[in-house]
Structures are given as C-alpha cells and as structure tokens.
Design a protein with these regions (language model features):
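Helix N-cap and loop-to-helix transition residues
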Residues: 27, 46, 89, 139, ...
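Pocket-lining segment of extracytoplasmic ligand-binding domains
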Residues: 107-190
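Bilobed "Venus flytrap"/periplasmic-binding protein-like clamshell domains
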Residues: 1-19, 25-26, 65, 69-117, ...
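Hydrophobic/proline-rich hinge and linker segments of small-molecule sensing/allosteric domains
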Residues: 57-78, 147-161
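Active-site regions of enzymes building and remodeling cell-envelope glycoconjugates
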Residues: 20-25, 55-62, 82, 100-104, ...
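Conserved residues at the C-terminal ends of beta-strands
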Residues: 45-46, 85, 122, 160
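N-terminal hydrophobic or amphipathic helices and topogenic motifs
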Residues: 1-54, 58-61, 78, 178-204
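Short linear motifs at secondary-structure transitions and domain/linker junctions
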Residues: 33-37, 47-53, 64, 68, ...
C-alpha cells in the first residue's frame, strides 16, 4: 500500500475518506521532510516548499481556493504588530507580497490574540476561531482573488522519485473526492464533531 502524507487539516478529509492508502499524518512543514526522507511515497506539500526544494509534482490533485477560504485568515488581535502561526508558509507569503505585512512566528494562536494586532491562522484552528466569532481583518483567499484573480494553491501533490503504485493511489484519492461530492454529509458530520464546530461552517 502506498504511503501518502495527509496534511493534518479538515480540508484533507475528502481526499482520504474512502481512499485505500496508508495515510501518514503530518503538519505543513513536516510533510516535505517525510517525502524527502523516504518515510512516505506521495503526499501534499505546501507549494512554497515544493518549489524551494524542487520536488516532483503530480499535476492531478491539489489543495487550493477560489475566493474566500475561511480556514486561512488574519484575525483581529488586541495587541500590536502582526503574528503568524509557525505552520504557515503560503498564506504568510501571500499577505506579505499583496499587503506588505511581515509576521512574527507564534506557536499558540489564541494567546497571540492578546499580544498581536493581527494573527494569521490556518487550518483547523482558523475554523475554530471563525466558529467562535473571532473577527478577522483579511481572508487570504479573498485578498488573493481580488488582487490576483487566479486560484490560490496552498498544497500540491508531490511524489518520491522511484516510488511504485502512485497511479493507483492517486486514483483512490480522486475516487474518494467523487464519493464526497455524491454524499458529503458523513464527512461534514465527522469533521464538525472532531473539531467541535458547527456543521454549517464545515459545509461552507
């Protein structure tokens, strides 16, 4: 069975819901290391790292947004300056290039709301903040769409050179996404329960 890096966020759920692959969970920055070190054969890697490391991309699946993304937002804090969770590379670079913002790295986004004027949060923690009504200054996908007008790619599918069974693994994930579109309710329910957020937000 092909070992596939699954980025540890809710948006990965449809890709792996019904896929017969060995999922290796990892954070954004860890994913590239697992592939480079041979601990996985295929996986999703932030597009910034894939480009920086010259990793071979499989142009079949990607994690991207067209317009507002909800799970990548600059939330309004009560302090000064701008902070970003350490896991983000793509969103921080996008806001740096488009809005001229630079960020201090933080580990705890909730604590950072007290210290920083704006906190860039991505993934599941961003969804929790939206669910709890934390106001935001900017939605990364929305800013990108308004300023650039193209889809914003967060993560691309990368293969380890020489790995076997990749075509079958990619097909498994494509079929899993197709199952999700046919019947999204079980995935929506599972994600809402796991994150402790409203079903309506997950549906968005």
């Amino acid at each position: 069975v092909v070992r596939v890096v699954r980025i540890r966020y809710a948006h990965s759920e449809p890709l792996f819901w019904r896929a017969k692959v060995e999922a290796v969970e990892a954070g954004n920055l860890e994913s590239a290391r697992l592939l480079a070190g041979g601990a996985a054969d295929l996986g999703f890697v932030p597009i910034t790292l894939a480009a920086e490391l010259g990793m071979p991309i499989v142009p079949r699946l990607a994690i991207y947004s067209v317009g507002p993304i909800i799970s990548a937002r600059l939330f309004k804090g009560r302090g000064e300056g701008f902070c970003a969770v350490s896991e983000t590379t793509v969103s921080a670079l996008a806001l740096n290039k488009l809005l001229g913002l630079s960020f201090r790295r933080v580990e705890d986004p909730w604590a950072a709301l007290e210290k920083c004027g704006g906190v860039l949060v991505v993934g599941d923690e961003a969804l929790r903040m939206v669910d709890r009504g934390v106001p935001h200054l900017a939605d990364v996908g929305e800013v990108w769409h308004e300023r650039v007008g193209t889809p914003l790619f967060f993560a691309v599918l990368v293969a380890r050179p020489g790995a076997e069974g990749l075509e079958e693994a990619v097909r498994e994930m494509e079929n899993s996404v197709a199952y999700f579109y046919e019947n999204p309710a079980p995935v929506v329910e599972a994600v809402a329960k796991r994150l402790g957020i409203s079903r309506r937000l997950v549906e968005e």
